[in-house]
Amino acid sequence: MGSGPIDPKELLKGLDSFLNRDGEVKSVDGISKIFSLMKEARKMVSRCTYLNILLQTRSPEILVKFIDVGGYKLLNNWLTYSKTTNNIPLLQQILLTLQHLPLTVDHLKQNNTAKLVKQLSKSSEDEELRKLASVLVSDWMAVIRSQSSTQPAEKDKKKRKDEGKSRTTLPERPLTEVKAETRAEEAPEKKREKPKSLRTTAPSHAKFRSTGLELETPSLVPVKKNASTVVVSDKYNLKPIPLKRQSNVAAPGDATPPAEKKYKPLNTTPNATKEIKVKIIPPQPMEGLGFLDALNSAPVPGIKIKKKKKVLSPTAAKPSPFEGKTSTEPSTAKPSSPEPAPPSEAMEADRPGTPVPPVEVPELMDTASLEPGALDAKPVESPGDPNQLTRKGRKRKSVTWPEEGKLREYFYFELDETERVNVNKIKDFGEAAKREILSDRHAFETARRLSHDNMEEKVPWVCPRPLVLPSPLVTPGSNSQERYIQAEREKGILQELFLNKESPHEPDPEPYEPIPPKLIPLDEECSMDETPYVETLEPGGSGGSPDGAGGSKLPPVLANLMGSMGAGKGPQGPGAGGINVQEILTSIMGSPNSHPSEELLKQPDYSDKIKQMLVPHGLLGPGPIANGFPPGGPGGPKGMQHFPPGPGGPMPGPHGGPGGPVGPRLLGPPPPPRGGDPFWDGPGDPMRGGPMRGGPGPGPGPYHRGRGGRGGNEPPPPPPPFRGARGGRSGGGPPNGRGGPGGGMVGGGGHRPHEGPGGGMGNNSGHRPHEGPGGGMGSGHRPHEGPAGSMGGGGGHRPHEGPGGGISGGSGHRPHEGPGGGMGAGGGHRPHEGPGGSMGGSGGHRPHEGPGHGGPHGHRPHDVPGHRGHDHRGPPPHEHRGHDGPGHGGGGHRGHDGGHSHGGDMSNRPVCRHFMMKGNCRYENNCAFYHPGVNGPPLP
């Protein structure tokens, strides 16, 4: 039926057997069949057809059958569907059908049809539909009111009939009267008996505590009051319908006329608790009584009435009404012989239940904020009321409460989903908290997005389509006179030209040729304070220029040499007078512009050429100034000082050796001897005691100073605890040579000492020295002559010249210069350059790089300021043979003493140029030069 388009005429023809001529359903069976077809209907045409058939049907039996079969539920489904789809014609048809059906309150309670219709009456957009729905709602409200009012009326009629029957039969049949009474009052009595029995139990219980079981005996005697009690209860059953709140005081007043007076004011109490009382009272009556009476028998009932002091007096008299009641009520139960048993059973059944109430009654106490006495009264009275409440309460409920409840529901459903609501209005704290959480999450997500946003283009840019604009109808400024005035003005004014580009770029590079600075000759008087030194240890490294301006043109080596020569032109340099530095430089470099300094440095024999040219002038002796120390070459002339000596300052002797650094990390020239040293520096014999003397040295001099010497004004230190300043004697006199770079080499005891550059080896005790550069003659070996007159080492080896005249012995290896100027003489090993560290000549041993460290065995001499390095005694004599062992050169190396290393007044030294230019010196307190305010008084 629901597949293709439906023709209503065809549909009616198919249903013709069930319908009469007017389209009305003929029989009850026909409506069942039509209902089954309606369930299958999906199209709007067929549904409207069926609804019209129902509208034509007038028979209430058929319509009631339709509702009972399920037609009302089906219409509810159709109504819901059409409301969601907002199908207004179908909605109107359904509302008309609902209006036509004979619906009752029970039918309306089955589903939410009434609510839907109510919503349509309020919120429908179609005015006709709203009117129709409101009419239907008003009809249904009338049905509800009529039914709720008819029900209690019918019940009252039944009651009156029963009572009338019982009364009329009284004179005729006294026996039947009792039965009729009991039957007529069965329903109320049964309900009443339970509460009454409860009432009896409660006071009996209370009195049981006080007086015992006496209550039960008097209760059987006064039977006469039966009628009066029944009449009173009947009166209350009939008249006071809104007694639902009376439970508080109803029970005590049941038996006595004063109770009537109490009832009336209590009737005015609000009805809000009607339903609650009906629900709560049935389970509680016995529980409250037993528990509360047991707790408080007499005094508590006085407090029971609600916070009103006036009411205390009637409550005080209430125990007597209870007693009276207990007596009367059993009598009421007595006339019917078969019934007394059930009340007793109820009592017995309730009594065991009394322990339970303690749980529930306290709750009532808390909620009502009443003392137990008040509650005591409540449950006692409530049993009397529940009968009235249940019967009358239901009637009343059907009349009034459904309406109020509907109003409440209607108010709730007024907020329809289709209704416009202010969404942004915060309803409660929960909503506010939700919004807060959402806003926080949103803020966090945006922050995270922004933090990870690399500003990359996500959507490719698309060129917008060009807009084709129509030509303007009016040319702007066509009638303007100002443009002519401006044109005339521009004829007599220079045009403003802006030649620079619109978008700025980097400025054009300006070509320029660096002009070499002019070479200014050194001033001999001023050069004393400008002793340069070089940061790096490589021979090709850039050195500080002696004059700041002229040196920038020279290669570093020449700059160093110039500085050293300039520094050496002091009053104590006898051989320096006849040297013209400018001529030497010109001869070395050729014409100033012929070769750049870089090309000169790349020549392999460049440094050798310089040395060969400088040797005849006696300039080679100082050695490379690159390390800050102009070491005295082995053949250097004695008078060739390379620094202006201070008063009593130390002076390097000609006996070779770089003289050793004067302390840890100490740069600068070594101090000259004080007042000459006849032992080492004989007058007129520059080589005396030097490395060229192979014979035994002069007489023993056990306490000669180490190479470092003492500070300018220091007193000579006491002799060290170890024997001999140059190393321990091993069976002979002290060595007369200064072996090793700054360290005395043990020459005795069968050790074959290893000589450093310029170190003359003592040949005492028949020891054969190993010939280093400038060493003594080896046995049968013819030493080669090194520059500066020092003889090369033995064994046919031609030593290489270390720059500055220190010749390293050994197999053709060119030693590297340590900053102390001493050259390691080991087999080609490069000693580790610690500033001021004496380099061991060991074969393969790298001496420790501490300041003033000793020789091959790794012994660290004590670098106490002003003390000589002690002779750390090595292995026993004859254990090591020269280069053979791991500690070449014997075990008696001593380190440099710390003559000038720490403290002391350096004001008699030249001012440190580095300190004056940069404000600090990289050698800090170990610098050999004068730092004003640090190692001497500040400058004036």
Curated annotation (Swiss-Prot):
Bias type Pro residues, positions: 644-655
One of the GO BP terms on file: negative regulation of mitotic DNA damage checkpoint
Modified residues (Phosphothreonine): T256
Highest taxon, organism lineage: Eukaryota
TFIIS N-terminal domain: residues covered: 73-147
Gene3D superfamilies: Conserved domain common to transcription factors TFIIS, elongin A, CRSP70
GO CC annotations on file: chromatin; chromosome, telomeric region; nuclear body; PTW/PP1 phosphatase complex
Subunit structure: Component of the PNUTS-PP1 complex (also named PTW/PP1 complex), composed of PPP1R10/PNUTS, TOX4, WDR82, and PPP1CA (or PPP1CB or PPP1CC).
Name of the protein in its database record: Serine/threonine-protein phosphatase 1 regulatory subunit 10
Organism listed in the record: Pan troglodytes (Chimpanzee)
